[in-house]
Design a protein with these regions (language model features):
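A cross-kingdom feature marking solvent-exposed beta-strand/loop segments within repeated
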Residues: 14-15, 22-30, 37-39, 45-75, ...
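Short solvent-exposed loop/turn micro-motifs enriched in small/polar/acidic residues
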Residues: 8, 49, 142-143
């Protein structure tokens, strides 16, 4: 019996920025399937812009933000939407992963703690910054750990950024700070989302 995947859910894109004609775009996607993951090539398009294609993925039973930071545009991007140039579902093999939930828990034991949002004053102006401590509680080393940082005011997304941490060793704890040069509204919550494809052969 071939099971049809539950379609990916996608929220409408957010657009932030405008300082020096640079904009940040992002959209949240969610995969409700328990035994299927997807890889894809995506881009953002609109009435007056189109970004370059980028490869991405989403694991089973997960949600994440797809981001495009620093888009150069003389005018604010209009009618933005997330589109896929290619998209493939992959079923998780019971033979290869007899207990995928356990496999995921063991491999993605990356947690962010002591998350704070604040401001730093410089001669060039004030910077917004997020600080956090990333702990790799797994038995695995990671050459790179891409991380998405999502800022909220209540339930509303008000900004995002990314950082990639290099050479995170098993059981390592690392303090990290990420800055924003542009102004931001009051932030009440910060999500730190490590983004590692543990199913990429």
């Amino acid at each position: 019996k071939i099971l049809t995947p539950i379609p990916l859910s996608m929220a409408d894109p957010f657009i932030f920025g405008g300082k020096e004609d640079k904009y940040d775009l992002g959209a949240e996607i969610a995969n409700a399937n328990e035994a299927m993951w997807a890889d894809f090539e995506y881009k953002f398009i609109g009435a007056n812009f189109e970004t370059k294609p980028v490869k991405g993925f989403i694991l089973p039973k997960s949600r994440k933000f797809i981001l495009e930071l620093g888009l150069n545009s003389p005018a604010r991007p209009l009618n933005a939407r997330l589109v896929f140039n290619s998209f493939s579902w992959h079923r998780i093999s019971k033979h290869t992963y007899p207990d995928y939930a356990k496999y995921q828990t063991e491999h993605l034991a990356l947690t962010a703690s002591e998350i704070t949002f604040g401001h730093t004053a410089l001669q060039s102006g004030a910077l917004n910054q997020v600080s956090f401590t990333l702990t790799n509680a797994s038995s695995y080393h990671f050459w790179q750990v891409p991380i998405a940082i999502i800022l909220f005011r209540g339930d509303q997304v008000v900004g995002f950024n990314t950082v990639t941490l290099e050479k995170i060793r098993s059981l390592e704890t690392r303090n990290t700070t990420v800055t924003w040069a542009e102004g931001l509204p009051a932030v009440t919550r910060v999500e730190v989302q490590p983004d590692i494809n543990i199913l990429d052969a």
